[in-house]
């Protein structure tokens, strides 16, 4: 009588929240770059260089950018953004739906509604 052993190995995807937190950290610490053009024997070559020399240069695993994000507060047909003016916001939220962020420093109006409705209750 013989015995067999089966060994199975697989890669598991990390927790979605962990991935989001990791990407947010990378985004928050992204390095701004500038494009430099210089001539070499094979023609013009473009390279990226850190915009601010006082910061350490980014590694291969760091996130870099060379264009600023568009302003999503104001309407912009080029980017397809409708802006945030007249949008509903959540006064108690500190997230992306919060008035502080969504209103882009323009302030906000608070509206209180009082409704009287029949509840069709049977007692």
Curated annotation (Swiss-Prot):
The keyword Disulfide bond applies. This is Protein Wnt-3a. Glycans are attached at residue 90. A lipid is attached at residue 1 (O-palmitoleoyl serine). Keywords: Developmental protein, Disulfide bond, Extracellular matrix, Glycoprotein, Lipoprotein, Secreted, Wnt signaling pathway. GO terms for molecular function: cytokine activity; frizzled binding. It is found in: Secreted, Extracellular space, Extracellular matrix; Secreted. It holds the Pfam family wnt. The lineage of its organism: Eukaryota, Metazoa, Chordata, Craniata, Vertebrata. Disulfide bonds join 89-104.
